[in-house]
Amino acid sequence: MFCYQCEQTAKGLGCDKIGVCGKQPDVSDLQDLLVYALTGLAQAAVAAKAEGVAVPLETGRYFAKAMFSTLTNVNFDAADFVPLINEAVAKRKALAALIKAQLPEGPASYVPALDLAGLIAQGHIHGLKDIPETNDDIRSLKHTLIFGIKGIAAYADHAAILGQEDPAVYEFLYEGMAATFTTDKDLGAWVALVLKCGEVNLRAMELLDAANTGAYGHPVPTVVPLGHKAGKAILVSGHDLKDLKQLLEQTAGKGINIYTHGEMLPAHGYPELKKYPHFHGHYGTAWQNQHKEFAAFPGAILMTTNCIQKPAESYLGSIFTTGLVGWPGAVHVKNGEFGPVIEKALAMPGFAADEDKGTVMTGFARNAVMSVAGTVIDAVKAGKIRHFFLVAGCDGAKPGRNYYTEFVEKAPADTIVLTLACGKFRFFDKQLGDIGGIPRLLDMGQCNDAYSAIQVAVALAGAFNCGVNDLPLSMVLSWYEQKAVAILLTLLHLGVKNIRLGPSLPAFLTPNVLNFLVANYDIKPISTPDEDLKAILG
């Protein structure tokens, strides 16, 4: 195996024995093989488009799901990748039968082995290092593109589940993956393709924003309890709002309280979700703390989308996966039929007594923020608000992430902190007060709600008649996995400069690629909170 797609990759270089995330070598090889098979499907789709042959939308949906399944902390069950690999080949063959062009040797001629051991052996020779390329910088950009495409695939899949999709997004997934096996592009062409990845991710996030707000309403500022009520309980982690909605419907009147964990916290702001009286509050913090937090939870646990870690024996019997999530030995529930989860919750003790642990606020997505835009603009003009910080991104276990806690704590009282994604859990419960009734800490949502932050920035730039880079706004970002890569590429596509990124820089970027980002976008690693605040504010 070789994998270096996440921020915590071993020694900052790459995992080659077992994933820091817990991914076993066989699963890593199967994921690589799936990506290889998908590249062959992508080559067929690109050839079909060139001949005017329509690629079914269903193929795009499958492609997004399959790529998403290889994202960090999604699926650790080797058996789940076998049908995905075979389906990629079947769909490729179906397209190939409709076109005149002879597809190239390689991914488009791949024949899967007949058993699991054979597939693992094939995956061994079709990994990241086996993609044809002799130029280290172009290889770096190819890998960056693959990881960005995984991020797009995650958002496209979520949006499609709620009925929002754009064939152009799927077409880019094909275009990008097919390109990774070409050798005729120079460095400039690869930079352009990577930036196009950011452009398409913006569209994918727009679709997901439309999907979530169309189904559940625009988020509104909402107070969320951090404590619990006495009684039976189910904890929902991940990102999938549809799964949560179905669970809320199926548990209504059953005496079970529903709690969010991790990136599900912003769900409390959606009107069509918060209306359920048994949707009580938020439990725990970010994904990397689940071993301790899940072990102490006295009810059933449902994992939607990514962020699962190896379950401890103490709760393996009470954790359930759904959608693309998989862990060997954990019960997987399909098609929103959460009866087994509910039965388990009813059989478990639940919380013995009420406990008040304070509250936090969420729901400050673009509609909520723009509804008070006039007040915000007036406060800036009056000197009451000096600066905005977007302190956002992924959380993780690697040392150095306390930087973000300290940065927010030390941000001056005349500044506003916008946040989103699970990086917020480094400071989400800090009491920062307000400026003229505007809370100084505004939780804008999940990682995909970077779309909200971008829309707010663009609107503020319009109000002040300046560019986004001229706003009193600084982005201090943390990253962990591939959705964060896609979001970073979106910001670069938009020309956003002076981004601070941490806790460490991606291992897949060569020094020359990093130098390009510094020279053209002034992207920089975080240093210390004091030094960075001084550099930003003077």
From Swiss-Prot:
Cross-referenced CDD domains: HCP
E.C. number(s) listed in UniProt: 1.7.99.1
GO cellular component terms attached to this protein's record: cytoplasm
Cofactor: [4Fe-4S] cluster; hybrid [4Fe-2O-2S] cluster
EC primary class: oxidoreductase
UniProt keyword terms in alphabetical order: 4Fe-4S, Cytoplasm, Iron, Iron-sulfur, Metal-binding, Oxidoreductase
Cytoplasm listed as a keyword: yes
Positions contributing to hybrid [4Fe-2O-2S] cluster binding: H239, E263, C307, C394, C422, C447, E481, K483
Cell division in keyword set: no
Molecular function via GO: 4 iron, 4 sulfur cluster binding; hydroxylamine reductase activity; metal ion binding; peroxidase activity
Cofactor binding remark: Binds 1 [4Fe-4S] cluster. Binds 1 hybrid [4Fe-2O-2S] cluster.
Major location category of this protein: cytoplasm
Modified residues (Cysteine persulfide): C394
InterPro entries attached to this UniProt entry: HCP/CODH (IPR004137), Hydroxylam_reduct (IPR010048), Prismane-like_a/b-sand (IPR016099), Prismane-like_sf (IPR011254), Prismane_a-bundle (IPR016100)
Record field: catalytic activity: A + NH4(+) + H2O = hydroxylamine + AH2 + H(+)
Residues where [4Fe-4S] cluster binds: C3, C6, C15, C21
Pfam families to which the protein is assigned, alphabetical: Prismane (PF03063)
GO biological process, one term: response to hydrogen peroxide
Protein localization: Cytoplasm
Transmembrane regions: none
Family: Belongs to the HCP family.
Purpose: Catalyzes the reduction of hydroxylamine to form NH(3) and H(2)O.
Protein name per Swiss-Prot or TrEMBL: Hydroxylamine reductase
Organism: Solidesulfovibrio magneticus (strain ATCC 700980 / DSM 13731 / RS-1)
Recorded name of the encoding gene: hcp
